Each structure stands twice: as C-alpha cells, then as structure tokens.
Regions:
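Ser/Thr-rich, low-complexity intrinsically disordered terminal regions
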Residues: 1-119
Length: 119
C-alpha cells in the first residue's frame, strides 16, 4: 500500500510505492505516452513534462528515488495552467501520481508479475 504525503506549498506530493525503481520509471513513461504528453528526461531519476490533466495543460516534474522499502515517487507542479486554483493544482498533482500508481498496480499486481518476482 503506498504511503502518501503532500508538502505544505501544495504543489508537490510524494508517495512511497512498493516497487523497484525500474518499474516506477517504466510506469512514468507509459503514463506520459498514453496521455500524449511532451516530456524530457533531465537526469536518470527526473522527467519534466507538459501534460493535460482534466483539460488543463500544466508543467510537472516527476522524480523517483530508491528507498530501502520501495521507491519514492515525487510529483511537483512546476507551472500550473493559467487560472488554475490551488485546489485544482492539488487535484492535478494527485491525478498524475494516481495514474502512475494505478498503472503499476494494473500491470504488475493484477497480472501477477509482481507477486512472482517477489517469491
């Protein structure tokens, strides 16, 4: 079960996912491609993306950090769509993180891959 936290400025969310870093990175690219997002890899752990969430085009930083028990996923709103409210920013950030988490659950847990690899 992922652990969630929202940072005080409301423009970032972090969650620890019970998957290795490689799977989380793959999920990020799959979600971005599925949503037709433009993105660039800035380093081995960070992707900057322009993505439409709920019809609002915003700029995000998506970062992964390997932890002792899983991988920390961090989604930060770098540039919100003009006029997007603070609650809209938080919903968009949560939607991006949820999409990545859901992809991992669907592809690894539901298909049994994750369970087989961890036996």
């Amino acid at each position: 079960m992922p652990q969630h936290s929202v940072l005080r400025d409301g423009k970032e969310t972090k969650r620890t996912l019970p998957y290795n870093r490689q799977y989380v990175i793959l999920a990020i690219y799959e979600v971005l491609d599925k949503n037709g997002a433009e993105y660039e890899k800035t380093d081995a752990s960070t992707v900057i993306s322009n993505m439409s969430v709920y019809g609002n085009l915003s700029r995000f930083s998506i970062c992964v950090t390997e932890q002792e028990h899983g991988t920390e996923l961090s989604v930060t709103m770098l540039q919100p769509c003009e006029g997007l409210s603070a609650s809209g920013v938080q919903r968009a950030i949560t939607a991006v993180a949820d999409s990545i988490s859901q992809y991992l659950e669907n592809e690894l847990v539901m298909s049994g891959i994750f369970m087989q690899k961890n036996r």
